Design a protein with these regions (language model features):
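Hydrophobic anchor residue at the start of the ABC signature
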Residues: 134
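Helix-to-loop junction immediately C-terminal to a conserved catalytic motif
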Residues: 25
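Conserved ABC ATPase signature
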Residues: 115, 120-124, 128
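Conserved beta-strand-loop-alpha-helix hinge in the C-terminal portion
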Residues: 205-227
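Conserved catalytic motifs of ABC-family nucleotide-binding domains
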Residues: 141
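ABC ATPase NBD coupling module
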Residues: 41-59, 88-91
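Catalytic Walker B motif of ABC-type/P-loop ATPase nucleotide-binding domains
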Residues: 145-149
């Protein structure tokens, strides 16, 4: 992939999109082949280097017992000694950094200033929780973002806004989310025009890899109707 590239990962349910993303971020081992990041295998990569690959899971994995700020702050754990990091997470939330990440994730500024950081995560709506998960990812400062259906079950307006915060680029071509590249799995093929490149899977096999602006309705029909 290239710097600034936005990749959509498409395929029917069961096509192994989530599995591919889990292998790419190192949380699942592949039976064959190798995943390399910046020229090095992620299997032998130091933990801190691997943290350059950030994952936005479909299940969010927010900790209900922690506040919004503590959940967001947990994104920075990989950059510190584990014991120091856990203590910092629980007792010394970086309010300024967390507010900045929440704003970049699209949370309302007035809501943030009214004490959202100290609110229990369980009080938030589904859309707000999705944005908190994105803010936690931004707190990690990843160079590569992998997102597993981040807009599933969201209202269309909220989904579109969340994609804006992930995909929009500066006039110089840099992703505003701070990453060098991003891969997002989708169940909404009508959104591929927002990406640069489309990868299609069928039953775990790569069957499509082409520029998004060259994708045709017939290509999508073959991808989703086969099998």
């Amino acid at each position: 992939m290239f710097e600034g590239e936005r990749i959509a990962l498409l395929g029917r349910s069961g096509s192994c999109k989530s599995t591919l993303l889990a292998i790419a971020n190192g949380s699942l081992r592949s039976e064959q082949g190798e995943v390399r990041w910046c020229g090095a295998s992620i299997r032998s990569m130091p933990r801190r280097k691997r943290r350059e690959i950030g994952m936005l899971w479909q299940d969010l994995l927010l900790v209900e017992e922690l506040s919004v700020g503590q959940n967001v702050n947990s994104g920075a754990l990989g950059r510190h000694n584990l014991i120091w990091g856990l203590a910092n997470l629980l007792f010394n939330v970086d309010q300024s950094a967390c507010k900045h990440c929440l704003q970049r994730a699209g949370l309302d500024a007035d809501l943030i200033e009214r004490g959202l950081i100290d609110a229990p995560i369980r009080q938030l709506s589904g859309g707000q929780r999705q944005r908190v998960a994105l803010a936690r990812l931004l707190r990690q400062q990843p160079q590569l973002i992998l997102a597993d259906e981040p807009i599933a079950n969201l209202d269309p307006a909220i989904a579109s806004d969340l994609l804006d915060h992930l995909l929009n680029r500066s006039p110089e071509g840099q992703l505003n989310c701070g990453a060098k590249a991003i891969v997002i799995s989708l169940h909404q093929p009508e959104l591929v025009h927002r990406f640069d490149r489309v990868i299609g899977l069928q039953e775990g096999e790569l069957v499509m890899d082409q520029p998004a602006d060259q994708l045709t309705p017939a290509d999508l029909s073959r991808l989703y109707e086969a099998g």
